[in-house]
Amino acid sequence: MAPSFDTLSEQDLHEEEEEEIDFSDLKEQFEVKLEEGLDTFIVIDGLPIVPEESRQKLIKFLLRKLNAVGHTSEDAVFMPTNDKNMSEGFAFVEYETPEQAIAAVKQLHGTPLDKKHTLAVNKLMDIDRYGREGRIDEEYKPPTVEPFKEKEHLRSWLSDPNARDQFALYRNDKVGVFWNNKNNPPENVVDRAHWTQLFVQWSPKGTYLASVHPQGVQLWGGPAFSKQKQFPHPFVQLVEFSPGESYLTTWSSRPIQVEEGHPVLSFEEDGKNIIVWDIVSGKPLRSFVSHDLAGGPVEGDAAPKKKVQWPAFKWSADEKYVARMLQGQSISIYELPRMNLLGKTSVKIDGVMDFEWSPATVTRDGVKQYEQLLSFWTPEIGSNPARVALMSVPSKEIVRTRNLFNVSDVKLHWQSQGTYVCVKVDRHSKSKKSMATNLEIFRVREKGVPVEVVDSLKDTVINFAWEPNGGRFVLITTGEAPSGAAVLPKTSVSFFAPEKKGPQAGNFKLVRTIEKKTSNAIYWSPKGRFVVVATVHSQSNFDLDFWDMDFEGEKAEGEKDLAANLQLMKTVEHYGVTDIDWDPTGRYVVSSASVWTHSMENGWNIHTFAGQTLAEHPTDKFKQFVWRPRPPTLLSKEEQKQVRKNLREYSKEFDEEDKYAVDIANTAVVETRKRVLNEWVAWLRREKELMAEEKDAYGIPEDADDAKVAKDAPPVSEDQGEAVVEEIVEEIVEENEEVIG
């Protein structure tokens, strides 16, 4: 019988216990875990070779850098020496945790120790893993040089001979990129199913198209839109590019879970929500846990809603700095590309609610050193008033402050060139029963940064927008709407422009106010001058008003001292409109109705800057329309002035080209009709020839088809023979299918 548990006696069981003693607890206590023990060690190469008496001095100097990324001590640094009592140029360092060792490798590798020495930092486990016997061939083999493969031109679309613009169209499960052909059907460049799972997004200069997937973000580019880069961030939901397309920020509400051996992500990213990436290398620079913002007022016992802070990181105009805010406490400014905290500390600002970088590098009057400007605001805390301030970076110097009282909310609006920053202040009365808005406009480039106050507004401002590259702005105000009102409250649209006073812009004055509107959105042309004021996301009003701020007609008497001549060019209606997008040249405007908002009459319409509707494109399950941005012009200011000066001459050429294009289109229609007619004539000729052959075969006269000849023709005699034509018709009355077993 085969031995089994059932056949063993009680004595046998006790004998087995006496023979084998369980040492598992002792083994677990005293076993040396080689893999875990070495995870905290790093190897630093590239150190100066110094004598024994200078070794401790070098270690202390090295500790300044080592402790900037983790915690270690002088005893945890081993720097070996040779027979001549000289150091070997490398050292072993032990950190408290493996995470600190990983951070040291990422942040210290490649950093200069002094002018002559650059650190090379690696994990000790990596050296053991890749340098052990058998991993490296003893015999040198020259590397194989891959044949040169020319990369795609990532800005090839700019060389289009007709200077057309491209756009991305997301509908149903397909994403396509098309050329804009004005009122003609758009020309397809590429169209792919399941190209993205959430949305698509162009980079700021139009070089890349980003698609979002559960696995991460992919960047596409070139004439064929081939894959350029990929950034693995599981369940990514939001994407943000830096202004110069050098960096990328990704966010997910789910903390990242990094699997062992991941080719890109390390344990440093584990548990984080945000990753800042280097686009060129495709590697993460640093990862962070996201900070939620305080939500709005909560009714009853409901849990407070968390609001996502996005963009979580905001970039300076030159990409040298990126900052994030811990609401109510501080602003952390990081230097790129190392992502080190500027000055090794965050800027402590009690109560800070929001901040914004200047969108351009500003040169202030009387200030010669380089700086980036950052504006922020804090609410009223106790007896301290609310405060708006401008901070210079990297010095962290406060260059201007402004105290505010009875403040409910503040919004910061920078002009595109950094010339002005408008602080929109919503104030409540002392009884807190009524609200009003006033504007505090900082003139950043002027000496001392003077502040101009616009306090003529009686109602609350719900939207504000600066003119790009200009000094004018548009705002929308509304009175207090009764709670629960089903009808949109009436709004007023106000246009402001500076006075004409010498070389510098004068004070801002009201040009005109248009009352009894329902408008709630402002869309400036990227080139300035033209603006669309619209009603979006409404169930009852869908107006788009096209305005010209520099109308060339006669100017109203009361507006002659202002740098504006306002004229309504046209009002159009687009049912269910949800989004409005200007093309980067300011020539065309697209209004669209997305299925993400509602499912009624989805699609997109294209208009000229003056409001003429060129084409309507009803599209089932339409989701997103995005124009492809253009990089900044390479022309100097003088060359741009020359182009504007000769614009009328260029316009004649463009008119000729447009006329030629219309003629070509008409010629194409005529040619198509001629081709179809010629094909029909050729077919008719062939049929007549076949009929003539058949008549000849049967002895039928050529003119037998003529009605008169057919009537007068003699009857066919018997001796001429008869032709009998039989027609067999088969009809299935019933059909049965029987299986014979």
Swiss-Prot record:
Residues 1-10 have a biased composition (Polar residues). SUPFAM superfamilies: RNA-binding domain, RBD, Tricorn protease domain 2. Residues 1-21, 696-723 are annotated as: Disordered. WD repeats lie at residues 193-230, 232-289, 303-344, 514-557, 572-610. It is found in: Cytoplasm. PROSITE patterns: RRM. The keyword ATP-binding does not apply. This is Eukaryotic translation initiation factor 3 subunit B. The gene is prt1.
